[in-house]
């Protein structure tokens, strides 16, 4: 193996490890992480088999961020994929498995806004993929903006049963979430275009992010630079009301002049 090939393989390995590390950070510590069937290396060729597993013992009651993890996987992959999370009652614990592609004949939970509870008896399994989750959001009229309403699975393990509750939960601080999204978008735009970040932040749409505490509001400053042609005073209001009358009077004067000129021409003939 050449050095270039070795360095490239190590970079791919590190890329996959970063994804798994992010997933471990958002999963509750009560769910133990296990290795998947195959390691992940190349974002352009994600494996079809299980890439991570989380195991929860009896009497565990935790919330699993299924949508956030699936979107992490979809953003990491550089090809079209439909991430799938499988949830299985093994008889002694609950098992969460992650796939970049839904396996053949893998079950999908029939949940909706009104019906979101699933009970698994021993050895039964269910799951959800990103496309099905998007359909649920569209059908229920849920906010589809990033990080505004994310699906979590509340898992209650009471053997021999596992009770699952698929719920959408919003951020605790919506304004802080909007600020974080604006900063992430600014960093991405700076990385893609290479333009001046301060210049982009100055001219970005004002609705994307509220101003920081103590910092000047850029949108207000931009709007204050645009001054009206005439100040809205009592005199200008009277002038605006008089404009239609003046236009009518001027037109009538033109008509009278034309009639007089035509009469004079006919008279002198």
Swiss-Prot record:
How does it get modified after it is made? Phosphorylated.
> What's an example GO cellular component term for this entry?
host cell nuclear inner membrane
Ranges of the Nuclear topological domain: 269
The residues that cross the membrane are: 248-268
- State the oligomer form and interacting partners: Forms a heterohexameric complex with NEC1.
User: What family is reported?
Assistant: Belongs to the herpesviridae NEC2 protein family.
Protein name per its UniProtKB record? Nuclear egress protein 2
Question: What gene is it encoded by?
Answer: NEC2
Q: Which InterPro entries match?
A: Herpesvirus_viron_egress-type
Q: How does it sit in the membrane?
A: Single-pass membrane protein
Describe the function of this protein.
Answer: Plays an essential role in virion nuclear egress, the first step of virion release from infected cell. Within the host nucleus, NEC1 interacts with the newly formed capsid through the vertexes and directs it to the inner nuclear membrane by associating with NEC2. Induces the budding of the capsid at the inner nuclear membrane as well as its envelopment into the perinuclear space.
Q: Which UniProt keywords apply?
A: Host membrane, Host nucleus, Late protein, Membrane, Phosphoprotein, Transmembrane, Transmembrane helix
Q: Where in the cell is it found?
A: Host nucleus inner membrane
Provide an example Pfam family for this protein: Herpes_U34
Give me the Perinuclear space side stretches, as residue ranges: 1-247
């Amino acid at each position: 193996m050449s050095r270039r090939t070795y360095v490239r393989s190590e970079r791919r390995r590190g890329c996959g490890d970063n994804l798994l590390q992010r997933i471990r950070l958002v999963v509750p510590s009560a769910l133990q992480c296990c290795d998947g069937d195959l390691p992940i290396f190349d974002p352009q060729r994600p494996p079809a088999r299980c890439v991570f597993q989380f195991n929860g013992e009896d009497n565990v009651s935790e919330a699993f961020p299924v949508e956030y993890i699936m979107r992490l996987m979809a953003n990491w992959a550089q090809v079209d994929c439909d991430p799938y999370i499988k949830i299985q009652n093994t008889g002694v614990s609950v098992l969460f498995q992650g796939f970049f592609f839904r396996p053949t004949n893998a079950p999908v939970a029939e949940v909706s806004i009104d019906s979101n509870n699933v009970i698994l008896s021993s050895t039964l399994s269910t799951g959800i993929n990103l496309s099905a989750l998007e359909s649920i959001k569209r059908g229920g009229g849920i906010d589809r903006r990033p990080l505004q309403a994310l699906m979590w699975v509340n898992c209650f393990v009471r053997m021999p049963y596992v009770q699952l509750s698929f719920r959408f939960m919003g951020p605790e601080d919506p304004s802080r979430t909007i600020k974080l999204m604006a900063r992430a978008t600014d960093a991405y735009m700076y990385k893609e275009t290479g333009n001046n970040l301060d210049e982009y932040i100055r001219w970005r749409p004002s609705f994307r992010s509220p101003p920081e505490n103590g910092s000047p509001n850029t949108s207000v400053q931009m709007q204050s630079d645009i001054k009206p042609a005439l100040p809205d005073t009592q005199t200008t209001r009277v002038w605006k009301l008089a404009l239609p009358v003046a236009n009518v009077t001027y037109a009538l004067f033109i008509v009278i002049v034309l009639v007089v000129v035509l009469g004079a021409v006919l008279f002198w003939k």
